């Protein structure tokens, strides 16, 4: 609802955020998590609403779930919503999201992250079995590249990774580069399963370079890791 007398947009669920209203904090991080978690699937509809809002003289936004947003904030807020709803990355960087049973996949993920940092890449590493899943999903949408590292589990992927990918695909994850790392001592199949999970996703580039660890890193898988780091730093 728009009040043209006071130039206030009462935006219902839009432009909200998680967190307490009596705490001064940056709007963007919790607004990102709120948008991706609740509105992320409906980017096309949000783009349509933003086009309508562009024709209004808005000085204040009052949402149902968040602080009152004033005129000096609105340019940044609207720009963020445009980026999120168009499924564009906010930041040129890499999220390395892993699950690990005995620690070897975690070691490989951390080693990749460190090598990427030496190549000048901005990297965040998250353990999907221990972090806030909603925050991991938000970070995947924030960054331009995603590395998924997981053991093979019952011929599939480890459950936390499977849930994570499902959260991404049901929110129309797109316009990103994805790289895959798998671990399995005798029949590693996780990379193939993950690739299949993204089959219906639009505008995803899944790199050909894949790291296959059989138990723990050896010379062969370390060479694959170096090749993946090179590919990620160049794309």
Regions found by a protein language model. Give the residues of each.
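Short gly/ser/thr-rich secondary-structure transition/capping motifs
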Residues: 78-79, 126-131
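Short amphipathic alpha-helices and their capping/turn segments at secondary-structure boundaries
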Residues: 1-9, 50-53, 133-136
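Short N-terminal or domain-adjacent regulatory/targeting segments
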Residues: 62-90
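Conserved beta-strand elements of the Class I
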Residues: 2, 9, 93-97, 179
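Short, charged N-terminal beta->alpha structural module
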Residues: 97-119
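Catalytic core of the metallo-beta-lactamase
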Residues: 1-25
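Cofactor-binding loop segments of dinucleotide-utilizing enzymes, especially the Rossmann-like FAD-
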Residues: 13, 98-101, 128, 182-183
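FMN-binding flavodoxin-like domain, especially the glycine-rich phosphate-binding loop
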Residues: 18-68, 111-126, 136-235
């Amino acid at each position: 609802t728009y009040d043209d007398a006071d130039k206030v947009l009462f935006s219902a669920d839009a432009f909200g955020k998680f967190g307490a209203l009596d705490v001064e904090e940056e709007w963007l991080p919790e607004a990102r998590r709120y948008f991706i978690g609740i509105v992320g699937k409906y980017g096309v509809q949000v783009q349509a609403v933003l086009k309508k809002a562009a024709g209004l003289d808005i000085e204040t936004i009052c949402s149902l779930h968040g602080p009152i947003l004033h005129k000096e904030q609105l340019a940044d807020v609207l720009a963020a919503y445009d980026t999120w709803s168009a499924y564009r990355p906010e930041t040129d960087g890499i999220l390395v999201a892993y699950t690990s049973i005995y620690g070897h996949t975690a070691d490989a993920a951390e080693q990749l992250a460190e090598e990427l940092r030496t190549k000048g890449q901005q990297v965040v590493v998250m353990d999907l079995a221990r972090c806030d899943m909603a925050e991991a999903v938000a970070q995947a949408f924030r960054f331009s590249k995603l590395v998924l590292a997981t053991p093979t589990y019952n011929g599939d992927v480890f459950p936390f990774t499977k849930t994570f990918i499902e959260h991404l695909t049901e929110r129309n994850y797109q316009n990103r580069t994805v790289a895959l790392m798998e671990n399995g001592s005798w029949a590693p199949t996780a990379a193939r399963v993950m690739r299949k999970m993204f089959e219906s996703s639009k505008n995803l580039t899944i790199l050909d370079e894949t790291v296959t660890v059989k138990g723990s890193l050896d010379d062969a898988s370390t060479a694959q890791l170096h090749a993946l780091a090179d590919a990620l730093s160049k794309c």
